[in-house]
Amino acid sequence: KYLLERSNTVIQVEQMIASKSPQFFDKSPFITRPTLSVLKRLFHESEVNQFLEKNDGCVGFEFIDRVLDHFNFSYQVSQVDRRNIPASGRMMIIANHPLGALDGLALLRLIGEIRPDVKIVANDLLMGFDGLKSLVLPVDNLGGKTGRQQLKAIMNCLHNEEAVIIFPAGEVSRMSPSGIKDQQWNQYYLKIAQKTNSPLLPVHIGGRNS
């Protein structure tokens, strides 16, 4: 039986699966138990929860700083590029997504240094992290569905003259014969930009995992 409750500072893989694929638990325990064990290791459930407990109470940009520091993750931006980031007014930042969650957090932190009214469109599973809730506009990437309320939340931020970060590929870049590249970008961000009359700020994220 999967766990239904979650404290403010821990994640539970069972609950994450239950929210996305409840039919998984209709299968035989001989299938679900070893699968859950593997998924917990893949998600580093124990290590993540140790980090969350250690940093309980940290939210927003402070939480991001703790995450980046934990992974010894740094980024560099030229002064010219930094000056291209408007300090106010509605704006959509569109970027490639080569490194997974860390590049999204780093981009959030960068924009937040210039203007704190920034949010990122990201997988709704991140809402399980209390430290990120105030900065995330959740969408269902795994289910391939973006609901009307989710789109409305994105557009409301732009109408409120805030900045919104979007990864149009909707997923992390993949290896291809010509290198690591995003999948085809979804054009929905153009429709949002047109409807809200929002300028676009393209960002290219380069880097590597070490």
Label each PLM-derived region with a short phrase.
Residues 91, 157-190:
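Catalytic-site beta-strand/loop segments enriched in glycine and acidic/polar residues
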Residues 97-101, 172-173:
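Gly/Ser/Thr-rich loops at beta-strand to alpha-helix junctions
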Residues 177-210:
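A cross-family acyltransferase "interaction/gating" segment
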Residues 112, 119-159:
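Conserved nucleotide-cofactor-binding alpha/beta core module
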Residues 105-111, 152, 180:
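"Short basic amphipathic alpha-helical interaction patches in structured regions
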Residues 119-122, 165-167, 200-204:
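A structural signal for short, well-ordered beta-strand segments and their strand-loop junctions
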Residues 2-94, 104-106, 113-115, 133-134:
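Membrane-anchoring hydrophobic helices of lipid-metabolizing enzymes
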Residues 53, 68-73, 97, 140-145, ...:
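Short, flexible loop segments at the rims of nucleotide/cofactor-binding pockets, characterized by
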